[in-house]
Amino acid sequence: MALLKNSGETAVEWVEINTPNELNSQLAQTIIDGYTKYLTIKDPMLAMGAFNEFKILCALKIGPYGANSVNHQAEQILQRKNLIGDNPAGGHSWYRGRPVMITRNDYSLGLYNGDIGITLPDPDAADNKLHVYFQDASGDVRRFLPHRLPEHETVYAMTVHKSQGSEFDRVVLILPDKDYPLMTRELIYTGLTRARQKVSVWGTEPVLTTAISRKIERSSGLREALWE
């Protein structure tokens, strides 16, 4: 905790967040600062690179501090700033800049659980038809019409669990306002080490200190539902 609170110019920052309202207030400028850059880029490869510079990671998937809620908040914030189009379906309609993560493998398309794509107009077409662009392991960019994608979700924020194996320049790690069995030192470590340059941890001191003192426990169905 001393490192987080007194990090100065180091790569770790602590932000005390005690209520959902405080979280939403803190998110407002963070979302604008983190995602404006990629939303102004037309080239798919450059947009994907800019998008991956910043990520919001949540310990939970559900609840006011979870990835689902933060994704909804992010869309509302970006809409109010006219950075994305109107999306009344809350993540289930398509607009320029929508980031999506595949949640079910489709071997015929070569798209797999955890793959992230960006929705953009075809830069070489006059009709501005939207495609979702993915970068594969070789660095090549592939595109798909939105209706062809397997199961997916909007991904301005993602769970720590889903972020494993990924790295970003800057990370915000959001902890819940109360303790859960899945809050372990391994989860905190995973969240912190997703950042190449800077990580900002948002939460309460009791939740963080309890998590750091707990080693990973055996999984359960409820744990997986909250975690993923």
Q: Where would I find each of the regions flagged by the language model?
A:
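Structural motif
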Residues: 59-61, 104-105, 176-178, 204
